[in-house]
Amino acid sequence: MIKRICFLLSLLMCGVLYAQDITYRTVKDLSYSSSKDPYATERCKLDVYYPENKTGCPVVVWFHGGGLTQGNKSIPGRLKKNGMVVIAVNYRLLPKVAISECLDDAAASVAWAFREVEKYGGDKNKIFISGHSAGGYLTAMVGLDKRWLKKYDIDADSIAGLIPFSGQVISHFSYRKMNGIDNLQPTVDEFAPLFHVRKDAPPLVLITGDRELELSDVMKRMRICGG
């Protein structure tokens, strides 16, 4: 599944699919947070995979899945050798931190991309945010709820596109569990992407299975508000 969706993402990025003759480099474990907290120092790191001696490349910031409770950064194989800069992000995990800190880490890493990606040949006007499962949830929240990036003086509308794969759009199940909410009780509060649907959001591609019925509500609300 993850291979198929990454292949689709590479198609969505358009125009660079056959850039196979380019040399690529990977820089690992760059810190994107100024926090001195030991857990933040451990987890708030990212890897940058980039084509050497190229400029103006599209950029994908990729968040891993794992229910917000596990997982580690990696560069999806199907995103490699496509002429893109790919930034794979680690973030702090529940239950060691609150969900607000997971979201703050996601925003901080995106802000880092806007500040630093040109050093690696990326175009800050072509930054796409993506991720699978929990990573898809973070993608949608950071792009739709503008307060997270505003903290870092970044307008979320500057994101070129949001491409969440199977990300929850109601409040995340791990967050609900931590707060004593029944797993089968759908909740839409300030930690639900659905709560933050807005007309002026970045372009949004929703890729999901047919069991995730709430995704259709996102599209319905986007159409109603004119997004």
Cite the ranges covered by each PLM segment:
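Active-site glycine-rich loops that stabilize anionic/oxyanionic intermediates
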Residues: 64-69, 210
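The feature captures the conserved acid-bearing segment of alpha/beta-hydrolase catalytic domains
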Residues: 153-161, 167-173, 185-221
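Short amphipathic alpha-helix adjacent to the substrate-entry channel of hydrolases
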Residues: 72-89
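Primarily recognizes the serine-hydrolase "nucleophile elbow" in alpha/beta-hydrolase
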Residues: 114-177, 188-189
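Alpha/beta-hydrolase active-site loop
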Residues: 97-118, 141
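Short beta-strand element of the alpha/beta-hydrolase
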Residues: 56-65
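Bacterial Sec-dependent N-terminal signal peptides
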Residues: 1-22
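N-terminal cap/lid segment of alpha/beta-hydrolase-fold proteins
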Residues: 20-54
